[in-house]
UniProtKB/Swiss-Prot annotation:
InterPro entries: FA_desaturase_dom, Fatty_acid_desaturase. This is Dihydrorhizobitoxine desaturase. CDD domains: Rhizobitoxine-FADS-like. It comes from the Bacteria. The keyword ATP-binding does not apply.
């Protein structure tokens, strides 16, 4: 068996679990303001600047660490662009656009409307549909759901991406779903064109300005290089952890994604800007990222949700009570299906 075929959400919508009126009332109070998004942006750029200055002023031996940390905080800026696409980064709509587009989307070579179309209009409503969910289609096309010999599977989804083997595929995914996609009937063509030419003007200004100031090499070494290396690697694993392998067999929204419970180091590298609260986001996309941990605490009043929450681990590491990591779950699923395929082939051989 090369491809799992138990896709229950093909051409159908997931079932939304209902919470009590009291829980929903508490959740409704979690709304964006006009300050916190800007504070998180300032934090991200402050760390990136600190990494740059430490390398330039202390030692170039710090450069590999700087590239890792800058990539991690660039990934954090993805959360900023993401919330702007959902219009939850700031209460004021114009401020939401300014923060999300100029300080996150454009610097990460993404366009706001492309992000909104692929994520808000395609990923969220068609979550788990192997024909319409762009995120799921990407990981299916790149072998995450293929059943392979266990060592080969581990190499393909873990070691190969760590050493850059999935970077071109992930870049193509970003190009398609975060930059070039425009096919949405409910968006004005003028907004998309403004976004498109605004992106080009932004980068012309950055490159021309840095060249004029003699800082072009700084932009390349401390922004472009991390973006093309660690940002891509971290992006692969973070997005892998959001829904894999749950979309293959689940139909209820609380089982289609997860919050992650990694340790401090894993959260520092793979969870900037509370990136680990992905289930909370899908359950309440109108809540800004900095309040998702409060949303989880509110939902923990529901016994069914609390039971689901007790099953989560980290991405690479076990959870606080020994819950299996995402990587362990993926490897175990592949091992089980691979052994099943061998047993089926053996049985057919005996029948023949």
């Amino acid at each position: 068996m090369n491809q799992a075929d138990a896709w229950k959400l093909r051409s159908s919508r997931y079932e939304a679990v209902q919470f009590s009126r009291e829980i929903n009332k508490q959740l409704s109070e979690l709304r964006p303001d006009n300050v916190m998004g800007a504070i998180y942006i300032a934090k991200d750029y402050a760390v990136i600047a600190a990494c740059t200055l430490a390398t330039l002023c202390v030692s170039w031996w710090l450069y590999p660490l700087a590239v890792l940390l800058i990539g991690a905080y660039q990934r954090g800026l993805t959360t900023i662009a993401h919330d702007a696409a959902h219009r939850t980064l700031a209460k004021n709509t114009t401020w939401n656009y300014v923060l999300g587009i100029l300080f996150a989307a454009y610097p990460l070579f993404q366009r706001h409307w492309a992000y909104r179309i692929s994520h808000v209009y395609l990923h969220h409503p068609y979550l788990g549909d192997p024909e319409k969910d762009p995120d799921l289609k990407f990981f299916m096309a790149n072998g995450v759901y293929d059943v392979q010999p266990p060592k080969r599977y581990a190499f393909n989804i873990i070691w190969k991406p760590i050493f850059g083997g999935a970077t071109l595929a992930y870049l193509k995914y970003l190009w398609t779903n975060r930059f070039s996609i425009t096919d949405s009937e409910d968006q004005s063509r003028s907004s998309i064109l403004v976004d498109k030419y605004g992106f080009y003007l932004f980068w012309i200004g950055i490159l021309a300005g840095s060249y004029a100031l003699g800082l072009l090499h700084i932009v390349i070494l401390f922004w472009i290089v991390p973006y093309l290396t660690t940002f891509q690697v971290l992006g692969w694993f973070v997005e892998l952890a959001e829904h894999s392998p749950m979309c293959e067999s689940e139909t209820k929204n609380v089982y289609l994604t997860r919050n992650r419970k990694g340790n401090f180091l894993e959260r520092a590298i793979l969870g900037q800007n509370l990136d680990e609260y992905h289930l909370e986001h899908h359950l309440s996309p109108g809540i800004p990222f900095w309040l998702l941990h409060k949303a989880q605490k509110i939902r923990m009043q529901d016994p069914g949700y609390a039971k689901v929450a007790a099953s989560w681990g980290g991405l690479f590491v076990k959870g606080p009570q020994g819950q299996p990591s995402v990587i362990t779950q993926l490897k175990e699923r592949n091992r089980r299906l691979y052994e099943q395929s061998l047993a089926d082939a053996h049985a057919k051989g005996h029948v023949a």
